[in-house]
């Protein structure tokens, strides 16, 4: 029985996983050969990097010895050992053995289930990351196929290239870390919101079918993300509030249906947040306890203070080289203090740290490898933002967009930027958390995509239709008008 459980079953499951990854890449290549090549290249680089890093650390080879952290692990991913050990114990002894207060319990439980099928090797966690990477690429491409034909490939290339080429995401994909898993469900959340935000120009039957897909996607995504990073779905729920306001203000047809869909998603999201985990519920309690602007600042200062107290080699100090984190010795209760801390935080998010140090704006005492990786990732992130902005601007000149979804995407990006810039003072943590901010940019062009056909439903807008600025079609004969 043990032979079947821990040898034959993992071998069979691993073979099926490989077949699934190959088929997914073939499907993407069938949609666009260039996209297929890009995704396959990203997958190949991740496999090669994961194998190299694993064996270097496992065999204690004399390569980057100071960064190695045991058999198969690295110091730049300290929490990976904790996730791995909890998941192995859960796979062997049952999920009930995972402590209720465990960090990112939903991810640990998912990893334990995965290891019970594929084996308890460290590399099993990496294979899960590879599946999440390919799945995220496929999800982006599936939605963006609704763009006009001549815009689809170039737009999808921007999003998929940003996902595939992010140095930080590439690194965390090679470790037993939660980021790839989390980002898949974060993109799923945006896809679900896109489905819910689209029906205002469609017949009621098509709108209900979109809702039948969108609400479960939003609920599932919130349940999972609440158990990984509980603050993210809380922020997304607030962004959905802005989307709902936009829908009500703009819609002229079926506005009650659209408002009901958005309201249902918010209610379901709140319930899902409660079910997600105790950690997720803790963030929800904080959110609902806020009554005044003073409560907001008190909560944010408390979160920021936790990073300041934690310290660390990559905690940012001011240009004078103070030992504390940025703003630790300043009066951040004042408007000027908050503005100064915020401006330094924004600079740290979007400007390479080496340049900030050269200008004496910030100072860090250590973390050389993480700083180098962070600088490269910052440059790539900036390029991605500019490319997305240019593509969005060009699309809006020719394709009728979904303004409510754009409101959601922009408000989500702005809230994430403001909160991370003020709260997170540790550069190493900030660079990893910045991957959350990439999600609204990867998915921003969803606003211009349409579903050509719903399961079992009538054709809606053809994917190759191009709309003029007034909303009339210039290709095809549907002639849908903007409402």
What are these regions (language model features)?
Residues 18-23, 137, 351-400:
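Hydrophobic, aromatic-rich transmembrane alpha-helices
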Residues 19-25, 127-149, 383-387:
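Transmembrane-helix motifs of polytopic, lipid-linked glycan transferases
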Residues 27, 146, 154, 201-213, ...:
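Membrane-interface helix-loop-helix junctions at transmembrane boundaries of multi-pass membrane enzymes
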Residues 31-37, 205-215, 248-264:
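Membrane-interfacial entry segments at the cytosolic side of transmembrane helices
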Residues 56-86, 95-110, 120, 352, ...:
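Extracytoplasmic catalytic/substrate-binding loops of multi-pass membrane glycan-assembly enzymes
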Residues 101-112, 117-135:
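Loop-to-helix entry region of an early transmembrane alpha helix in multi-pass inner-membrane enzymes
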Residues 123, 140-165:
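Transmembrane-helix signature of polytopic, membrane-embedded enzymes
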Residues 170-171, 204-230, 236, 241-244, ...:
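Membrane-interface alpha helices of multi-pass inner-membrane proteins
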């Amino acid at each position: 029985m043990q032979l079947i459980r821990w040898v034959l079953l993992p071998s069979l499951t691993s073979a099926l996983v490989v077949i699934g990854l190959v088929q997914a890449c073939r499907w993407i290549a069938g949609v666009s050969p260039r996209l297929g090549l890009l995704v396959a290249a990203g997958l190949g680089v991740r496999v090669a990097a994961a194998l190299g890093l694993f064996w270097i650390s496992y065999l204690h080879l004399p390569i980057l010895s100071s960064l190695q952290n045991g058999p198969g692990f690295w110091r730049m991913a300290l929490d990976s050992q904790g996730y791995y050990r909890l998941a192995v114990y859960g796979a062997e002894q049952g999920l009930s053995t995972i402590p209720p207060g465990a960090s990112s319990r939903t991810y640990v439980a998912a990893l334990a289930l995965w290891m019970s099928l594929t084996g308890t090797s460290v590399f099993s966690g990496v294979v899960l990351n590879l599946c999440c990477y390919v799945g995220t690429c496929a999800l982006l491409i599936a939605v963006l196929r609704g763009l006009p034909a001549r815009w689809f490939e170039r737009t999808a290339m921007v999003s998929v290239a940003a996902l595939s080429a992010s140095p930080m995401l590439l690194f965390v994909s090679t470790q037993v870390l939660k980021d790839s898993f989390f980002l898949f469900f974060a993109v799923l959340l945006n896809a679900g919101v896109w489905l819910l935000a689209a029906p205002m120009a469609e017949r009621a039957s098509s709108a209900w079918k979109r809702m039948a897909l969108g609400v479960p996607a939003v609920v599932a995504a919130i349940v999972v993300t609440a158990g990984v990073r509980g603050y993210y779905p809380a922020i997304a729920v607030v962004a959905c509030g802005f989307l709902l306001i936009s829908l009500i203000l703009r819609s002229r047809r079926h506005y009650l249906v659209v408002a009901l869909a958005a309201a249902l998603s918010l209610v379901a999201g709140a319930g899902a947040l409660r079910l997600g985990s105790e950690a997720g519920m803790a963030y929800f309690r904080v959110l609902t306890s806020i009554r005044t602007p003073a409560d907001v600042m008190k909560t944010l200062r408390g979160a920021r203070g936790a990073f300041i107290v934690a310290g660390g080699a990559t905690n940012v100090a001011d240009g004078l080289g103070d030992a504390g984190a940025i703003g630790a010795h300043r009066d951040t209760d004042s408007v000027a203090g908050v503005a100064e801390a915020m401006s330094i935080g924004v600079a740290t998010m979007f400007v390479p740290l080496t340049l900030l140090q050269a200008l004496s704006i910030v100072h860090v005492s250590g973390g050389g490898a993480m700083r180098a990786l962070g600088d490269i990732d910052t440059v790539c992130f900036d390029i991605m933002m500019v490319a997305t902005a240019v593509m969005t601007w060009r699309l809006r000149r020719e394709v009728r967009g979904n303004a409510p979804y754009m409101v959601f995407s922009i408000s989500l990006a702005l809230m994430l930027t403001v909160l991370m810039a003020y709260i997170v003072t540790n550069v190493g943590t900030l660079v990893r958390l910045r991957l959350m901010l990439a999600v609204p940019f990867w998915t921003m062009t969803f606003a211009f995509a349409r579903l050509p056909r719903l399961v079992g439903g009538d054709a809606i807008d053809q994917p190759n239709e191009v709309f003029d600025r007034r909303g009339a079609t210039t290709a095809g004969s549907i002639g849908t008008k903007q409402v």
